[in-house]
Amino acid sequence: MYVPEEIIETIKMIEYQNLDIRTTTLGVNLKDCADKDLDLLKENIYNKITSYGGNLVETANKVSQKYGIPIVNKRISVTPIGLIMGSTLKGLSDEEAIDACVEVGITLDNIAKEVGVDFIGGYSALVQKRATPEEKMLIRSIPKLMTKTDRVCASVNVATTKAGINMYAVKKMGEIVKETSEITKDAIGCAKIVVFCNAPEDNPFMAGAFHGPGEGDAVINAGVSGPGVVRAVVEQLKGKDIGTVSDEIKKTAFKITRMGELVGKEVASELGVDFGIVDLSLAPTPAIGDSIANILEAVGLERCGTHGTTAALAMLNDAVKKGGAMASSNVGGLSGAFIPVSEDAGMIEAVEVGALRLEKLEAMTCVCSVGLDMIAVPGKTPASTLSAIIADEMAIGMINKKTTAVRIIPVPGKDVGDSVEYGGLLGTAPIMPVSEFSSEEFIERGGRIPAPIQSLTN
């Protein structure tokens, strides 16, 4: 039974505090689409995705209208393409194999445009231990794919807690990001490439979403967005102790999650597919007031990035998880607080005034999801340094048994003090400094960093 106060509170959240459903993401299994013939493979993929997702946008809009809750993005994720390309690429030269992978990516892009979704994820490879020949070709094809498509997102899982870190893949991904930055306008292609440790199979958020091998045939996963709501609550708690702040954030996260599950289940029911999970992540936008950094500042920090930031973020992240887990039994995905620099107005300001640096962001990723996200660095940054930044972040995820990721953008012709404007949800990225000292010899070693011991945890 809802009371009038709750209804008014929800209206305030939506109208004044930027509360919305960030995404309803349809995951589709493509394992049964594999075929030796490339044209048949593409046809199978088209038929499978459109049969489930043809009405996704229309259905989400209908549910949004029914409940008066904005659903900002409608997206699709698919089985990692690296898992279904083996028979298609057999016997092809490297160049032919790369072109075949890109053709599949173009098919995904065309499907996304036809059904009207914002992004389609799953141009992915899972190579935490070793890469198969087809996965190597898929990874090599990513830069070319980014020049040919608009809505396809790529991700590569290079590490897990159980497998360790594949340093060959880490090295390669630094090179892939660097190459992509040089051949796409303002390095925009890099905004659609994520490198993961412990990638979740049910993540609804881009650019790292894919439909994991352990998922069913089709499923709806929902992601909520409520930094503005949490900030409004925290601002009413001046002088209260941190335990009280945590409790109030928990209660707020409960309400946000309950709304996300309601909408996600309704969309799934209308489409005739299973409901998967609601992702508890607080996802910021460039809109003023819809910022994770501003929440931390409302807790009592002069600027996000100063001493105490990691502790405040740990409290926030844990409170959101506790409140969300109470609201739903179907929790998954990344489920934490996102700290993407270019997508968070408060983070952008913190970087611009010198309060927030790459090293502090790395420390913050130890206590939240999902990692170094939408970080713009000077275009002159060498591939080995990009690989080393990736390796550091993968190590944090591997040791701490959590998902970490890197989405980094070396912007050609830009240096510290400059910024690059992407618009929309991707926002504005100030160029952040990286170390001028080389990591090249370390990266050139290759090999695999072994999985960590599980009993001695200090």
UniProtKB/Swiss-Prot annotation:
State a single Pfam family of this protein: DUF711
Which SUPFAM superfamilies does the record cross-reference, listed alphabetically?
Answer: PFL-like glycyl radical enzymes
- Superkingdom is Archaea
What Gene3D superfamilies would the database entry show?
3.20.70.20
Q: Which family does it belong to?
A: Belongs to the UPF0210 family.
Protein name from the UniProt record: UPF0210 protein MmarC6_1246
- What's the source species for this entry? Methanococcus maripaludis (strain C6 / ATCC BAA-1332)
